[in-house]
Amino acid sequence: MDMTSCVARRTRSRTESYLNSILNKSKGISGEEEDQSLGCVNSRTEKRRVNMRDACSPSPRKKKRRRRKDDDDDVVFVRTEYPEGKRDDENVGSTSGNLQSKSFDFGDRVCDFDADDRNLGCEEKASNFNPIDDDDDVVFVGTVQRENDHVEDDDNVGSASVISPRVCDFDEDDAKVSGKENPLSPDDDDDVVFLGTIAGENQHVEDVNAGSEVCDILLDDANLRGEEKTYVSDEVVSLSSSSDDEEDPLEELGTDSREEVSGEDRDSGESDMDEDANDSDSSDYVGESSDSSDVESSDSDFVCSEDEEGGTRDDATCEKNPSEKVYHHKKSRTFRRKHNFDVINLLAKSMLESKDVFKEDIFSWDKIAEVDSREDPVVRESSSEKVNEHGKPRERRSFHRVREKNHLNGESFYGGEKLCDGEETINYSTEDSPPLNLRFGCEEPVLIEKTEEEKELDSLWEDMNVALTLEGMHSSTPDKNGDMLCSKGTHDFVLDDEIGLKCVHCAYVAVEIKDISPAMDKYRPSVNDNKKCSDRKGDPLPNRLEFDASDPSSFVAPLDNIEGTVWQYVPGIKDTLYPHQQEGFEFIWKNLAGTTKINELNSVGVKGSGGCIISHKAGTGKTRLTVVFLQSYLKRFPNSHPMVIAPATLMRTWEDEVRKWNVNIPFYNMNSLQLSGYEDAEAVSRLEGNRHHNSIRMVKLVSWWKQKSILGISYPLYEKLAANKNTEGMQVFRRMLVELPGLLVLDEGHTPRNQSSLIWKVLTEVRTEKRIFLSGTLFQNNFKELSNVLCLARPADKDTISSRIHELSKCSQEGEHGRVNEENRIVDLKAMIAHFVHVHEGTILQESLPGLRDCVVVLNPPFQQKKILDRIDTSQNTFEFEHKLSAVSVHPSLYLCCNPTKKEDLVIGPATLGTLKRLRLKYEEGVKTKFLIDFIRISGTVKEKVLVYSQYIDTLKLIMEQLIAECDWTEGEQILLMHGKVEQRDRQHMIDNFNKPDSGSKVLLASTKACSEGISLVGASRVVILDVVWNPSVESQAISRAFRIGQKRAVFIYHLMVKDTSEWNKYCKQSEKHRISELVFSSTNEKDKPINNEVVSKDRILDEMVRHEKLKHIFEKILYHPKKSDMNTSFF
C-alpha cells in the first residue's frame, strides 16, 4: 500500500468522527452521551487501524483459483452487535470464516443480504428488524477490498481479514428518500460517499422508491473526494464505480462482490448498469432467512460478458411479481453488432427515398452508453490502474474506436457515398483521405534551374561518391558502423580544402568538404548577385507576361485553324498535344467518321467506315490521345456508348486520365465495386440494399446506356460476362456487352491475338465495327498472331489480310533463301494496312528525353554456379528447362525452388543440395546477383533508382533477402516488390512512391508479366533485365516503363546473360523478331524516322565496375546497341 492510500484512510477516519458529531448534535445528544458513544466508536476505530496497519504490509501473492458457488453464497455478513456485558476486545464484524457455514445471531434480529441482488444494483437488502433505540438505524453496511485483493481459495471465500472496513453512519431521518444528501464539510468530505438508505420498521419496502428523484452515486476506491452525481429517474437506484467512457463497470460492495470481480470476467470489466438496462428497481429488499436454499445464484440470475470485438452481451431486466412482491431477474440477449445493420438499412432507406440522413438518426444508439467524460482526474487514474485476473493492466479501449469500427461496415456497403447532414457533409469514403495542405494559399516556390557550372560540380561529387563506394567494396574487414580505426590509435583531424576534415595518419575522412559550411565573409552580397536573383525570381512584368503567353496549357488556338473541323469540339486542346498525337486524332476521325469536317458529318457516320490501329511506341501518350478523341466524339455523337477494354492493371490509369484532363464525362469502371456518384438515380434505387457484384455492375451498365458516358472493363471480366451463353442470369450481360457498344476501344490491343482463346472469340461477336486498337508492340511472336489482331480491328478486310499474311509466313519459313521475297511481301502488306494503321516510332522520345543506352552484359559464372548449370537435364520439358536455366543463372541456390528430375538427383547429389542451402544469402556465389547487388549499391551513391525485371517471383524474393542482409534495407522503404499477387491499390501506392524523387525507395523488383505494360516508372533511370524471353515485345514494353514522357534522366538498359548458356541464342531469335516488327510497322513519314545518333556516350557506373580490381573478372563481354553482325556471332 502506498502513502496516498494510508493518508486517504486516515482522512476517512477523521471524516467519520466529524459526521458522527454532526449526527449526534442533530439528535440532541449531550456531551456525556456523546463521549459514551465515542467510546464505542473509538474501540471500533482502533481495531480498524490495526487492520489498516496489517493491510499496509505486503502479503505474498497466492495462486488465484476459481471455485464453484454454493447455494448459501448469497448470505453476506453485515454486522455484529454485542449486548451490554460483552467483551470489547472481541473482533467486531470479522468475516474470516466461511460464509456458507455461518449464521449470526443479533438477538432475534437477523440481516441477510442477497449477494446476487446486491451485485446487480450495488445495494443491500435489509431484513425486517425493529430498531430498539435511536442508534439502531446506524448499521455497518459492508467492507470494500483493496484493489489487489482476490479470493484465494475455498476456505476464505469473502474473507476480509486483511481489509480495512469502511463504515458510513447515516441517520435515517436525515437521509431523504428523494435522494438529496446532507452537504459535507468542505474540509472533511474527501473520503465520504453516500451509499443509500435502509427502510425503517414501519416503512414499506416499496416506499423507498416513492420519490421521483433517486440518487445515483458514483463510487470509486480512488475517488477520495466522494463526489456525488445525481440523475433523474423514476425507479432506478444504482451505485456505479466506473469512470470509463466505454464500459461503466459496476462497483461491487462487500466481500462476495469482490469474488465476481476477481473471476474470469475481471479483465473485461464489471456489469454494465445504465438507465436502459433496468426497467425497475434492481435492489429491492427481500426478507429471507440466512439458511434459505431457494435463492437464485448469481450464475443463473445475472451474467454479463463483453468480448473485445463488440459482440454479444447480456442485459438484466427485472420483472415484478405483484403477488409475492419479489423481483425476479430475467436475461435478455442483444447483439451489439446489430447497429451495423441498422446503419446499413438506414442508408439504404435514404438512398431509396432520396432524402438526407441526419447524425442524430445514425448515432442515436450510443447516446445512452456515453458517460460524461469530464470526470475527476483522480477517477481516471484509478480506472487506468485496475488489473485483471492475470495481474496485467486492463486494456483501455476508446469508445470512439468502437464507433469508428462500426462505421467501417457501413462504409464498405455504399462504397464511398456522401450523406448530407444539413450543411455539413459526412464523407464515408473508404479511400485514404488526402493529406492536409498546410501550404494552402501560399505561393509555390519557383524551382531554380542549376547552371552548367553547378551541374558539373554535382557530377564531380557523384564521381567521388562512386570512387569511395568502390574503394570500400569487398573489403576483407568491413566496418558495420562506418568508423575506421586509426593506426595511431586516435584520429588527428585537419581541414583539407579539397577533401574535407581528414586524419593526418590514415585515409579516414570525418566530414567531406561539401558538407562544411564556408566562412560567411567570403560571400558578401554584390551587384552581380542581385542580378542573378532578379533573373531567377521576381522578373519584370513584361517578361512574366511573355512567359505565360508561351505556355501551351494557357494558349487557346484561334478559330481560324479549327473552324469547321472536329477540333472545334475541343477548343484549346490541339496545341497541348504533340504533333504525332494531332495526326493520330485526325486519323481516328477519318477512319471512324470518314472526315474531319463538321459539315460533312452526319448522325450515323460515313457508310463503310471501320476500325483503326494506333501503333505508337510505348510511352508516347496513346491514352491521352484517345481521351481527347472520346471527348470530341461524344459531343458530336452523344449516344455512341463507347466501351474501353484494357488489362486490369490499367483500369485505374484510365480513371485517373479522365479525371486529370477534366473531360467532364462519367467513367464507369466495371471492375470496381464502388459507385462513382454519377450513376442513374433510378438504377441505384433498384438495388434495395443488394450489394452483390453483378447488381452493382448492372447499375453501371444501365447508367452507361442512359447517359453520355464511358464504360471501362478489363479483358478477364469481359470474357467472363460476355462468354456465358447458357448461364442463368448472365444472358443479359452478354447481350448488353456485345450489342450495345457503338464504339470499342482496346488498350494493349495485341492482347487478344490467339484465335483459340476465348477472349478473341467473344470480341469477334461484337456488333459494332467502329474499333480503335492501341498498341506499341503490335507484332508479338509470328505473322499468324499479327493476322488475328488485324482481322479484329478491321473485320471488313479480314479475307484480304489473311491471304497476304499467309503468303508472307511461307516466305519467312524458307530461311535465308526467302529473305528477299519476305521483304518484298512485307512492303506490300505495309501498303495494304497503311490506311487504317497509324505508326509512330517514338522520335518524340529521342527529341525530348535525355537519352537511352541499351547494352548486353555477358558474365562469367563462379565454380559452384557453373557446375549446377552444366548438370541441368536438357532432355526434360522445355518450360521446365527454361525455368531452371533462368533461375540457376541468377543464383545457384534457386535450383532448390525447381522440380528436379531423377537424372539431376543422381548427378547433383544430396551433398551439393546441402551446400546450396547454405549459399542462399551469399550473393557473390551467383554472378548475376553479384553484379546486381554491387550495381544497386553504387547507383544509390549517385541517387539513381534501379528497376529490376524477372519472370519468376522466387528470383525477386531471393534478391530482396540478399539486399536486406547486405545493405540492411527494409521491404516497403528502400526495397519495393511488385508482382501479380499484389493488390491493384497497393501497386499504385508503390508506383507513386517509387516515382517520387525525394522518397527513400532505391530499387523496385518487378515481375515482367505484371509490370511491363501500361504503367509509368519514370523514377528509375537504370533498368536491369535478368531473364531473356522469347517475345521481344515483352522487353520493349518493360523498357518503355522508364523511357517514356516524363523521364528526367538518361535511361540505361542492361540485359544480363551467363557465358556458355543458351541465353544468347534466345536473345538472337528475339532480335530477329524485333527486326521484322520494325519492317512492318515503320513510319512512312521521313520526319518520323528514328534518330541513330547515340545520345548517351558514357556509363560511368558500368565503366567503374569494369575497371575495378575485384569486379572486372566477372565481365566476359559488353555489347552496346548490338548490330546485325553481332547476332550471327557466337563468342561463347
From Swiss-Prot:
Record-annotated Helicase ATP-binding domain positions: 603-796
Major place of residence: nucleus
Q: Does the keyword Nucleus apply?
A: yes
Record organism: Arabidopsis thaliana (Mouse-ear cress)
Kindly list the organism's lineage: Eukaryota, Viridiplantae, Streptophyta, Embryophyta, Tracheophyta
Q: Where is the composition biased (Low complexity)?
A: 233-242
**Where is the motif (Nuclear localization signal)?**
47-54
The residue ranges flagged as biased composition, category Polar residues, are: 92-103
Subunit comment for this entry?
Interacts with NRPD1.
Report whether Iron-sulfur shows up as a keyword of the record. no
Report the Gene3D superfamilies cross-referenced here: P-loop containing nucleotide triphosphate hydrolases (3.40.50.300), Tandem AAA-ATPase domain (3.40.50.10810)
UniProt lists compositionally biased (Basic and acidic residues) regions at 81-90, 255-269, 310-326, 376-392, 525-539
Q: Which InterPro entries match?
A: CLSY/DRD1, Helicase_ATP-bd, Helicase_C-like, P-loop_NTPase, SNF2-like_sf, SNF2/RAD54-like_C, SNF2_N
Q: List, as start-end ranges, the regions of compositional bias called Acidic residues.
A: 243-254, 270-282, 291-309
Q: What Enzyme Commission number(s) does the record list for this chain?
A: 3.6.4.-
**Gene that encodes it:** CLSY4
Give GO BP annotations, semicolon-separated: gene silencing by siRNA-directed DNA methylation; positive regulation of post-transcriptional gene silencing by RNA
Q: What is this protein called?
A: SNF2 domain-containing protein CLASSY 4
What family does this chain come from, according to its entry?
A: Belongs to the SNF2/RAD54 helicase family.
Q: Which PANTHER family match?
A: SNF2 DOMAIN-CONTAINING PROTEIN CLASSY 2-RELATED, SNF2 DOMAIN-CONTAINING PROTEIN CLASSY 4
Q: Where does ATP bind?
A: H616, K617, A618, G619, T620, G621, K622, T623
